[in-house]
Amino acid sequence: MGLESTAGSDRRGLAAEVLAGTRRRAAVRRAHARPKATFELRASARARHVRRHGRRLPTSCVANWPERLGPAPDHMLSGVPDHVDGRMLETARSAGARLIGADRMWHYPEGVRNPEPIWSRHGIRILSGPSPLWLDANGRRLPTPLFPGFDALGVVEHLGRAGHEHSWFLLNQRILAAEFALSGSEQNPDLTGRDRRMLLKRALPGQTTYVEEFARRCPDFVRADTVRELVERMNGLAGEPRIDAEELERTVLARDRQVESGLGKDAQVTATAAARRFIADRLVRVAKPHRLLDPAAGPLVAVKLSMLTRKTLGGLETDLAGRVLAADGEPVAGLYAAGEVAGFGGGGVHGYRALEGTFLGGCLFSGRVSGRALAQALAA
């Protein structure tokens, strides 16, 4: 579903069409989608009074960088459109609002460049199963339990404190086909379009999935038949020879021996085997354990991962009516907050590690509460 504004220069209202979903890429969707419904919103005299005497700030934002995560990388991909820049936080602060929870952020370490970007520095998050080796920028394995799919925020902190701008997944084609997924509705046309036939490709062997097509186009994927060839391409992509081929080959061989013998103590290999005890993961999420260097499972694949910005979990301190509070605890006259900027009821009700669908309910609830409170204040 999409919105196509037809409001023109009228700043007192909005007329729009609700567009039917299509499976075309976002850049051409509006040109081909069919209108399913239309609506108009017009500002009444009472609404214009609200603009003059009371303002509600419903916004999402990304701002700040927590000291506990180490220095912010010079190069980051953007997981949100350009307009989601956090500037409204500073605007509210300049009006007297108190910001809290500025160290509460959620970013992802598994970002890759979108080969068909919709906004600047558009990044896509890889949702990986547990089998790939996760390496730092020097080609060394991350410590336990920083495995794919385990503790994304822990990886962000580890890489930041170590001064690494990027990291790597090391896997092979068989693991890529079985375990990789992409975050976002645009990257999952089978789910977005409710296409059961396309969805079945995720479970059927020998099928080319949308993820594999994406991987062929994305410049952050490199492939080779041997570790030495792969390292040469990894260093070329990174722009500097930071990874030693002999050291990485020893790492891969040690991992493969543990898988082959079935007697090793490698925590990641053990965790992968445990994940396959759940039938759904065994069918569509976790590849059967095998050697990374198995020629039948090749070629080898390395993915250069960059930091992907996503969420500021703190925000403006509010009371239970959604009124924004100043440093002295008193409401800022006429200023209300709703949505992510309110932290869903006080600037950070979800703590440090809330994400994904847990945001929607808080946005709806805080919007309802602050809207009612503002209406009551105007009616008084």
Where are these regions (language model features)?
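Short, well-ordered coil/turn residues at beta-beta hairpins
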Residues: 7, 47, 51-56, 137, ...
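A conserved short coil-to-beta-strand element within the FAD-binding core of flavoproteins
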Residues: 3-30
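Catalytic phosphate/nucleotide-handling subdomain of diverse soluble enzymes
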Residues: 326, 330-378
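Short, small/polar residue-rich loop motifs at catalytic or cofactor-binding pockets
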Residues: 127-129, 310-312, 356
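Active-site and channel-lining beta-strand-loop segments
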Residues: 21-24, 130-145, 314-327
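A glycine-rich dinucleotide-binding beta-alpha-beta segment and adjacent secondary-structure elements
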Residues: 243-345, 349
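Glycine-rich loop(s) and the adjacent beta-strand/alpha-helix scaffold that form part
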Residues: 37-39, 44-116, 156, 356, ...
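An anion/pyrophosphate-binding glycine-rich loop and adjacent beta-alpha core
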Residues: 89-91, 98-243, 247
